[in-house]
Amino acid sequence: MHIERIERIIGSDSGQMAYFKRDRERHTVIFQYYRRELIETVEFLTQSIIPSEINQYVFVFVGAAPGYDVAYLRQLFPALKFILFDPKPISQDIDGDTEIHQELFTDDFARQLSARYKKKKILLQCYTRISSKRFEENLSMIRNWHSILGVHRGAYEMTLPYDSDGSSLFLKGALYFPVWSKPAGADCRLITDFDTNKLVRYSHRYHEEAMAYFNCVTRTSIYTKNELHLPSIYDACYDCTAERQILSEYVCDFLCVKHGSDAYKKKMKELCTDISAYFKDNCPQLPDWFVGW
């Protein structure tokens, strides 16, 4: 299928289809875990920060190890305060104003950070991997941190249960389709509304069927409207197109470079080329905990 523009947010008009197993199906998409973390975090920070006020923000990242994405992220947001938490070690050298805590994030840490940065705007990102049996417990834990910290905006991994007609209560926001994810994964990310503790219900069945359509149709389609032609780096797939769009928003909205200008084209080519080379040469495609497709 050929489509002009990509879809980033799961909405009421998103395509849906019944989930089915695809174990023997030949996949045409690529799973790049650390590249996904980087690109999706760039999207979150670009949409959440006013560049001229960047010293007013603190970025708290729970689940930051081993740090391949964070090391590159520091280059893109050099003036932003980073606070990283993970019981596993951060194996990369992280420059800039960065605190690293090799331990689990807890309510006590949330209270400490809330007191220390009560005049700042806290951006919280959580990559917490947990079994489906403890899914609701995980959501409750994140809701609690969000409330204690008085989070300005949060980005949270969301994997709602399969084959369920139930729903889950969680923070109000927009569910974003993944980039460079597993071929049949159901995980996406929720980016909350600004300065909210409002809770809404998310339908398990709607989420399952929207993600099934995304994996089988949206992500495997060809996207015809790509303004930046870089055939040695990108093709016209969903992931390449989404990455280009997210980086374009970063260049225009965060770096304040005029869209379509010579400076824009130069910066985009440099950035896209460098990111592609970085993930090819400096980090594994899959994390060590990943067992198989």
Predicted segments, located by residue:
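Class I SAM-dependent methyltransferase Rossmann-like catalytic core
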Residues: 1-55, 293
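Rossmann-like AdoMet/SAM-dependent catalytic core
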Residues: 5-17, 60, 67, 168-293
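Well-ordered, non-membrane alpha-helical segments in soluble/globular domains
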Residues: 30-44, 100-103, 110-111, 133-148
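Conserved SAM-binding loop of SAM-dependent methyltransferases across substrates and taxa
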Residues: 66-77
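Short beta-strand element of Class I
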Residues: 80-83
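S-adenosyl-L-methionine
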Residues: 85-119, 128
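A short SAM/SAH-binding and catalytic strip from SAM-dependent methyltransferases
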Residues: 120-134
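Conserved beta-strand signature within the Rossmann-like core of class I S-adenosyl-L-methionine
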Residues: 150-159
